[in-house]
């Protein structure tokens, strides 16, 4: 159809049609850079698929791309012997012109400060959980929080309520809920309950998939923060992520009690340590659940390693949950560092 179209629009349409006829096609996905400096664009979220595309190293260098960037571009048809189609042209990076993001700051160079802008949890008259969190351990943008929970104390419900509160009270925040080693039905429930990205690696997937997805999620969050955005990552759970690293990482030879390899605790610490409030705009908030009283010595060792790393802790009480008192928050053991910056 050519009626009413300008010459430039017609030329563009002819170019696109000819490119498609030759086998070129569009792609949009998240970039993951490999150790050999080439990259892969994941076309379907954070998971590997047959539609993933190869990105040559020279394109990554010339455009100064980083893992976690969302790339839009066109693919050339795969040649004989190629596993997958290759990226021929970059159209946008993170929704912007590639030239605009060439000089963006590095995440590690940004100045971290204490959280000073609150993320209110209370919304409406029925948000008892949100009100309790606001009083006991307020959350701010850039918080590094641990939700410490024994089994069956309502941890998943509280995480869900936190996600719902953030999407209602702070719609400008980019919300990512990361579920590691979870049951598939809980993933579906979370997808239907919250407005935000739900990224899951279920318990029937290998440990190296858990670690790969977690690293890609945190890199994606860093790319948003570098451009001045606010991100909240809700992780369920840091204990299972550490277990996955313990299985997937090569053995260092130094084994702690409970069978935990000492080298396996560094990557999840790096994940949690990425949370920070940036001085001149932007923040990365991480709220991670940690399991206790599971009867596993490994879980106990993992929790002890992470106990002092957060600046906010919300502890759930099994005795309250057994008496059907919800939310089962322990007000004495819970709290936030420098909470005076978050309370009016």
PLM regions with names:
Residues 3-8, 24-27, 45, 80-84, ...:
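Conserved phosphate/pyrophosphate-binding and hydrolysis machinery centered on Walker-type P-loop NTPases
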Residues 14, 33-35, 43-45, 75, ...:
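Flexible glycine-/small-residue-rich
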Residues 20-73:
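S1/OB-fold single-stranded RNA-binding interface
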Residues 23-27, 128-132, 217-222, 271:
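Phosphate-interacting basic helix/loop segments used at nucleotide- and nucleic-acid interfaces
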Residues 65-67, 77-147, 153:
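P-loop NTP-binding catalytic core
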